[in-house]
Amino acid sequence: MKKETIFSEVETANSKQLAVLKANFPQCFDKNGAFIQEKLLEIIRASEVELSKESYSLNWLGKSYARLLANLPPKTLLAEDKTHNQQEENKNSQNLLIKGDNLEVLKHMVNAYAEKVNMIYIDPPYNTGKDGFVYNDDRKFTPEQLSELAGIELDEANRILEFTTKGSSSHSAWLTFIYPRLYIARELLKEDGVIFISIDDNEDKQLGLLCDEVFGQGNFVAKLPTIMNLKGNHDNFGFSDTHEYIYVYAKNKDVCSLGQFDIDESEVEKEWDEDEYGLFKRADTLKRTGQDASRKSRPKGWFPVFINSENKVYVTDDDKPLNEDDYVLYPVSPTGEELSWSWGKKKINDEFYNLIVIDIKDGKNIYKKQRPALGELPTKKPKSIWYKPEYSTSTATTELKNLLGAKLFEGPKPVPLITDLVKIGTKKDSLVLDFFAGSGTTAEAVAYLNEKDSGCRNFICIQKDEVINKTKNAYSLGYRSIFEITKKRIQEVFKKSTTTSDNAAKIGFKVIHTIDDFRAKVESELTLTNHTFFDDAVLTPEQYDALLTTWCVYDGSLLTTPIEDVDLSGYTAHFCNGRLYLIAPNFTSEALKALLQKLDSDEDFAPNKVVFYGCNFESAKQRELNEALKSYANKKSIELDLVVRN
């Protein structure tokens, strides 16, 4: 029987990274756990990896603290909104809207969603001085504690605590804020995943250097200037700003592939023709060009091609036309040089429909037809500067106002812009994450694109429960937090959707929120005067559900995975992804007997792990459960791991 307490590990600024090294390179550590640098260099040199002698890095006050934040466990638990989630339109959905500090939520997600996200889009605070960004941190450290955990001098620890506790909007504060979020976000991306990050000039340079550090310089894909306001922002000195930037980084550029844009109908009509085999346009001549194109270099490519009265191209084995009047063409250049055909005889006869005959001054020429990929519309590669009239910020504001019936949110991102990012960053079954959800543009873009191309993409949007200022119009209309606006927008989007319930996973959405980790409080209150070893932990319904949800995610289950209630002679247990959870008190001998019987008789019930809440199982009951499960030879020969968890 294993005992564990989730989120209780003592982490430092590099503890997780050292754990990775120890797991993969144990020979690089001595018996006392000290790292032997030369050993690792020997391994690298033996693999013929080229070592760079030149390097640079981004340093700022708070970098060690930011690394520590990335490694620290969450201080919260996850709870679901059961009333919302059990509604007909939401109960089978794979979409998620999560309320809470995004760093906390990301820390929870990494247990279940590591390498499961295809695309991330975020629109973080720009730190303009006017967007309200101030770094606030409610983690309580003494200078001595921070110095030890982050591996820094006491003086630096004091200076870091000064800006984290008093609030700061410096570059250092912004970098300290964004670093741990990007670090964990990378862990969530699939190996071929991609992240898009909107930013403006205020933190542009810092963000680029930071992304190089987090994702690797070699995984930089693009920095896209994006025209958001053609009129320009006249408040700036010297020039009227018309654009922002979108940084694009891959998790692994070697395996990442970005999509292309569909060509609209007017472009199709303008650039493409159509025959009975589909769309096409004229491509290269059938005559070979370039080096080694001559008859001498490729003698088998020299033969006559015939064109009949209907401009059908063909060849014959004996190099004689089927009709005397058919046109004869050899691969000769305009200067008279004898060349070769780029297709052989068999391909010419098999794919005559992919050739075009063009009349020219001195006779005829043959060109190949370029066709779009099978079953796909023609596409075009995205340009490195992004502009469409519908990317306008003012248009986005108007459209959101029309959707919600009033102006509730300042500066929403345009749906067409995010739709285009989703289009090139995903496939039809991808998972999209936005952990600065704001007004919910990403959710709407995913829903819109699904409707347009019959996709099954899902979104996870995370939004802090940020209080709305009483002077804002949204407050006067009854909204008390940005999250309420996000939720309302997504609800309205799905109300207007024509998507049917045939694919329930892509309509509706589930709501999850964070709550304070009550366990720490309970443990601190366990004294000899108010607690005995025979007391059970009294949990509210919300605490009970939060503990169950958090445990499931901690053990690797997605937040949308169904949790099945299991009746054990009046005791309710919970079954999820092969794990059985026992949280409630009063687990009786009858419940144990029912569990053993169910293991034998229910062919669909095959847990591989039993997790129970230690606070509700006294020591004697723990031993009884452990001995019974370990000694009982169930008919399915299931080996059960038993974990007591607090």
From Swiss-Prot:
Q: What is this protein called?
A: Type III restriction-modification enzyme EcoPI Mod subunit
Q: Which gene encodes it?
A: mod
Record has Iron-sulfur as a keyword: no
Q: What is the effect of changing residue 316 to I?
A: In c2-440; defective in DNA modification
Please give the positions of the paired cysteines in each disulfide bond: none
Q: What class of enzyme is it?
A: transferase
Q: What's the source species for this entry?
A: Escherichia phage P1 (Bacteriophage P1)
Enzyme Commission (EC) number? 2.1.1.72
Family from the record = Belongs to the N(4)/N(6)-methyltransferase family.
The record ties this protein, via PROSITE patterns, to: N6_MTASE
Source organism superkingdom = Viruses
What catalytic activity is recorded?
Answer: a 2'-deoxyadenosine in DNA + S-adenosyl-L-methionine = an N(6)-methyl-2'-deoxyadenosine in DNA + S-adenosyl-L-homocysteine + H(+)
Report the InterPro entries cross-referenced here: DNA_methylase_N4/N6 (IPR002941), DNA_methylase_N6_adenine_CS (IPR002052), N4/N6-MTase_EcoPI_Mod-like (IPR002295), SAM-dependent_MTases_sf (IPR029063), T3RM_EcoP15I_C (IPR041405)
Q: Amino-acid biosynthesis as a keyword? A: no
Further remark: This R-M system is also called EcoP1 and EcoP1I.
Q: Where is this region: Binding of S-adenosyl methionine?
A: 123-126
What UniProt keywords are attached to this protein's entry?
DNA-binding, Methyltransferase, S-adenosyl-L-methionine, Transferase
Coiled-coil intervals? none
